[in-house]
Design a protein with these regions (language model features):
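Short beta->alpha transition motifs characteristic of CBS
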Residues: 45, 52, 96, 108-114, ...
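Long hydrophobic alpha-helical segments typical of transmembrane helices together
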Residues: 212-262
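Hydrophobic residues at beta-strand termini and immediately following loops
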Residues: 6, 55, 108, 132, ...
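CN hydrolase (nitrilase-like) catalytic-core segments centered on the catalytic cysteine
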Residues: 60-79, 148-234
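Cys-nucleophile CN-hydrolase/nitrilase-fold catalytic domain and related Cys-dependent amidase chemistry
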Residues: 15-16, 23-100, 107, 171-189
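Active-site catalytic loop in hydrolytic enzyme cores
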Residues: 86-159, 172-180, 245-249, 259
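Active-site-proximal beta-strand elements of phosphoester/diester hydrolases
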Residues: 1-12, 38, 94, 107, ...
Length: 264
């Protein structure tokens, strides 16, 4: 499977400009033979303009129509990063998954909101894990800060996911965290991690890029720099069975010993 990660500087507050950027890059990936393209977090408006509520996509209709048309016209699967969706008066950080025929397969609202950045003042949190199939391949997606919660990612692995997608808007000062956490989640869950970040700036934020494809051994198969680019790599899902046969952490788990509520 050939996957392209669309790493680009998002234009704050300008949905149409960002639609145009995404369209051109996805078309380029499709022409290069990619089976799938993956977008970063909040690629429609960035993170986030002062008038975000008024600019938000009501029920995600604009983004869904755009992604479905783009996927069908390019015959490419899309992990639609995330967009600002308005629903019942609240805003959600929402991901849409679309197959190569333009059918919406799944959606996800970011569940862990980044309180140091005040996300909880802007967005309402989601309340469910996102696992889905594209073709016959079980997959899952999370969003940015969700990556720091290992138990959340482990739930995706236990649900059978073979690929975890991580759209993000990860800032440059924590680049090392980004690289380590993505590799760690791949190793401990013995699946592929496909993590796409934005680049450029938004206000005081500078995003670190370095979109990555990581195999279940934690080896980086493809990685971008800190600027605009399409990062492309190929994955071979057959290695998952081989790795799990050699070190079977799922067989050796002791869930009866794990008590995760703890103290806040």
């Amino acid at each position: 499977m050939k996957i392209s990660l669309i790493q680009f500087p998002i234009v704050p507050g300008d949905r149409l400009a960002n639609f145009d950027q995404v369209r051109r890059r996805v078309q380029q990936a499709a022409r290069a033979g990619s089976d799938m393209a993956v977008l970063p977090e909040l690629w429609d408006l960035s993170f986030y303009p002062p008038d975000v509520y008024d600019l938000a996509d009501e029920e995600g209709r604009q983004a869904q129509a755009f992604l479905q048309d783009l996927a069908a016209s390019c015959h490419i699967q899309l992990i639609g990063g995330s967009i600002v969706r308005r629903h019942d008066g609240c805003l959600y950080n929402t991901t849409y998954i679309v197959d190569e025929e333009g059918n919406r397969v799944s959606s996800y609202d970011k569940c862990h909101l980044f309180t140091p950045g005040g996300e909880e003042k802007v967005f309402a949190p989601g309340d469910h894990l996102n696992t889905f199939f594209l073709g016959d391949i079980p997959m899952a997606s999370i969003t940015c800060y969700d990556l720091r919660f290992g138990e959340w990612v482990r739930m995706a692995a236990l649900a059978g996911a073979q690929i975890l997608f991580v759209p993000a808007a990860w800032p440059h000062p924590r680049l090392t965290h980004w690289q380590i956490l993505n590799r760690d989640r791949a190793i401990e869950n013995q699946f592929f991690v496909v993590a796409v970040n934005s680049c450029g700036t938004c206000g005081d934020y500078r995003f670190c890029g370095h979109s990555m494809i990581i195999d279940p051994w934690g080896e980086v198969l493809a990685q971008g720099g800190d600027g605009e680019e399409i990062v492309t790599g190929e994955i071979d899902l057959s290695v998952i069975k081989d790795i799990r046969s050699r070190i079977n952490v799922f067989r050796d788990r002791r869930p009866e010993l794990y008590h995760l509520e703890g103290k806040r």
